[in-house]
Amino acid sequence: ELKGRVIAVTGSVGKTGTKEALRLVLSRQGKTHAPVASYNNHWGVPLTLCRTPSDVAYGVYEIGMNSPGEIVPLARMVRPQVAIVTTIQPVHLAAFASLEGIAEEKAGVYWELEKGGTAIVNADIPQSELLRDIAKSGPAGRIITFGESPDADVKLISCALKPDMSVV
């Protein structure tokens, strides 16, 4: 069993970039483990969990999906204290009737938070309120929103994308 903080990242896009940013930042705070690639499916998540040293301070796990019913079982394996949904995009519409259906599936990660955990929600997407409502109805003790929206708890003030780095 992991003694460190466990973070789950899901979303239609941005999972790997978010995972890598978290790995970079958290590794300066303590021993951090994250998958070396996009191991975010029913094979990759258990493999990553098995490869995680028990003494890490932080474990960062990507959770992906292709069809309904995939997020909750993977999140249940991970048992995060922090869960992030990066964004919702029309990349899974072949398997879902709407963007709201995709959002509901992705929000399944919030249902598997440890009691009192933190749900992190993108404030800049149309499904933000739906994601917040789902997070409120689960075990989350805290919900943090992020983005450029004036209502976001954590606001992006400026961003410069350069060939070898991003400055925020």
What are these regions (language model features)?
Residues 100-103, 140-168:
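Adenine nucleotide phosphate-binding catalytic loops in nucleotide-utilizing enzymes
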Residues 1-123, 129-140:
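Phosphate-binding loop of NTP-binding sites
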Residues 124-125, 167:
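Heptad-repeat coiled-coil segments of the DHp/HisKA dimerization-phosphoacceptor module
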